[in-house]
UniProtKB/Swiss-Prot annotation:
Residues 1-45, 96-119, 180-215, 278-293 are extracellular. GO terms for cellular component: plasma membrane. The gene is OR52B6. GO terms for molecular function: G protein-coupled receptor activity; olfactory receptor activity. This is Olfactory receptor 52B6. The lineage of its organism: Eukaryota, Metazoa, Chordata, Craniata, Vertebrata. Glycans are attached at residue 23. Keywords: Cell membrane, Disulfide bond, G-protein coupled receptor, Glycoprotein, Membrane, Olfaction, Receptor, Sensory transduction, Transducer, Transmembrane, Transmembrane helix. It comes from Homo sapiens. The chain crosses the membrane at residues 46-66, 75-95, 120-139, 159-179, 216-236, 257-277, 294-314. It is a multi-pass membrane protein. It is found in: Cell membrane.
Length: 335
């Protein structure tokens, strides 16, 4: 094992020197090396095991959730359509990062082309769509609880189509300037990214140019986009909870709180780790070791995708019943 690792290091250094030599003054670099989790190299194999388990669980859970929603006509409602979008985004996020990270942790395959790095970064930061979908789900619950008689007339198929289009456009519009800014930077010979995957500032720090605009754009995009979504979601749930506690029927109140509870769990699972990671990175400084930042970021791309299907499967009765029906139909069909 030690000889294999030594060989990988020699090959990596040779490739790095070759790439650097070709790019002394180029605006682009041929490729990048991802370090994995620096400071924990001896634990890479052991760390890869829980990451692999969580990734497989996330794929299976979200895959089942999407199949249940698509196969059961009773679940072809706005809330479940948005939930299937969230599950699809979770699969995209974890699949964009984990296979490459596991190849790095297991085999030391750390090289990734520059275009591949930009592509990975694009899909990772495409998670802005998570925020837009969570906002759409909050709006759905707001209409269902605060204006139940108008629910069908407000959330028509046409309106849902517009919401889906807006969520996708929202993410593309935010991400394209980041790609443009990175493409037009001048890069140095150093092409090592201390991370398990490519992200905006990790790539920007490889540049010899001034990256102030990248820093400010990233901060502005996060604050104006995600911050606005958080504010609107909070306002929606304040109105929702006010309406729920005004309900006279105890059963109706319990059902509404159960549905909203699932949504709130998913919202907290998405925003709390993200905000903690951002604030720890920006204000933790040297007091928080680098490997802690990278470990948290790596966990963030697998833990929410792994837990979201569990939260909805356990707490949402129609999905649980739909899953039972789907597996029952599959069992009958196999006989």
């Amino acid at each position: 094992m030690a000889q294999v690792r030594a060989l990988h290091k020699i090959m990596a250094l040779f490739s790095a020197n070759s790439i650097g030599a070709m790019n002394n003054s180029d605006t682009r670099i041929a490729g990048c090396f991802l370090t994995g989790i620096p400071g924990l190299e001896q634990l890479h194999i052991w760390l890869s095991i829980p990451f692999c388990i969580m990734y497989i669980t996330a794929l299976e859970g979200n895959g089942i959730l999407i199949c249940v929603i698509l196969s059961q006509a009773i679940l072809h409602e706005p809330m479940y359509i948005f939930l299937s979008m969230l599950a699809s985004a979770d699969v995209l996020l974890s699949t964009t990062t984990m296979p490459k990270a596991l190849a790095n942790l297991w085999l030391g395959y750390s090289l990734i082309s520059f275009d591949g790095c930009l592509t990975q970064m694009f899909f990772i930061h495409f998670l802005f769509i998570h925020s837009a979908v969570l906002l759409a789900m909050a709006f759905d619950r707001y209409v269902a609880i605060c204006s139940p008689l108008r629910y069908v007339t407000i959330l028509t198929s046409k309106v849902i189509g517009k919401i889906v289009t807006a969520a996708l456009s929202h993410s593309f519009i935010i991400m394209f300037p980041s790609i443009f800014l990175l493409e037009h930077l001048h890069y140095c010979q150093i092409n090592i990214i201390a991370h398990t995957f490519c992200e905006h500032m990790g790539i920007a720090h490889l540049s010899c140019s001034d990256i102030s605009i990248n820093v400010w754009y990233g901060l502005a995009a996060a604050l104006l986009s995600t911050g606005l979504d958080i504010m609107l979601i909070t306002v929606s749930y304040i109105h929702i909870l006010q309406a729920v506690f005004r309900l006279l029927s105890q059963d109706a109140r319990s059902k509404a709180l159960s549905t909203c509870g699932s949504h709130i769990c998913v919202i907290l699972l998405f925003y709390v780790p993200a905000l903690f990671s951002v604030f720890a990175y920006r204000f933790g400084g040297r007091s928080v070791p680098c490997y802690v930042h990278i470990l948290l970021a790596s966990l963030y791309v697998v833990i929410p995708p792994m837990l979201n299907p569990v939260i909805y499967g356990v707490r949402t009765k129609p999905i649980l019943e739909g899953a039972k029906q789907m597996f029952s139909n599959l069992a009958k069909g196999s006989k």
